[in-house]
């Protein structure tokens, strides 16, 4: 068996019905489109969501919510992830260097999840109340 000899089993695949090729084909003359009307014409169909002039569903329902402009630029870091940083002073750039956050992140917040085993000094990084207590308990500080 070779790749160029692979073929489906005989009779397993049937050719698609060809439209408009005589009445004997079963889909001749109008090619399954019926008689006249918009849907029988070439290029004739309504846009997605069109309900024949009735107010469409997406316009009947109220708008809600908004897209936050800062969503993509804020990151959260767990407390135990700070153990991977081999530096006494942790800044935004330090976290980027160690691959803990993406390069385009502008603000970071440390959350109290897990434990921290070493003393670190946070500079220019926000943290929760629980995370601050844990960092100070381990001998670090938050600036």
From Swiss-Prot:
GO biological process: translation
Family: Belongs to the universal ribosomal protein uL15 family.
Xref: SUPFAM superfamilies: Ribosomal proteins L15p and L18e (SSF52080)
InterPro entries: Ribosomal_uL15, Ribosomal_uL15/eL18, Ribosomal_uL15/eL18_sf, Ribosomal_uL15_bac-type, Ribosomal_uL15_CS
Keyword annotations: Ribonucleoprotein, Ribosomal protein, RNA-binding, rRNA-binding
Protein origin, superkingdom: Bacteria
GO cellular component, one term: cytosolic large ribosomal subunit
GO function terms (MF aspect): rRNA binding; structural constituent of ribosome
Species, as recorded: Francisella tularensis subsp. tularensis (strain SCHU S4 / Schu 4)
Gene3D superfamilies: 3.100.10.10
Protein role: Binds to the 23S rRNA.
Subunit-level organization: Part of the 50S ribosomal subunit.
Disordered as annotated region, ranges: 1-52
Composition bias type Gly residues, residue spans: 21-31
Protein name (database record): Large ribosomal subunit protein uL15
């Amino acid at each position: 068996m070779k790749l160029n000899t692979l073929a489906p089993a005989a009779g397993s695949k049937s050719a698609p019905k060809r439209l408009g090729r005589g009445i004997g084909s079963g889909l001749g003359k109008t090619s399954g489109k019926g008689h006249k009307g918009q849907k029988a014409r070439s290029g004739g169909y309504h846009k997605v969501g069109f309900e024949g002039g009735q107010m469409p569903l997406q316009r009947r329902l109220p708008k809600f919510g908004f897209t936050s402009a800062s969503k993509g630029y804020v990151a959260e870091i767990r407390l135990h992830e700070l153990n991977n940083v081999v530096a006494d002073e942790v800044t935004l750039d330090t976290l980027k260097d160690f691959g803990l956050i993406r390069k385009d992140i502008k603000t970071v917040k440390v959350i109290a999840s897990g434990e921290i085993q070493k003393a670190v000094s946070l500079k220019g990084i926000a943290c929760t109340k629980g995370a601050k207590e844990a960092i100070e308990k381990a001998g670090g500080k938050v600036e």
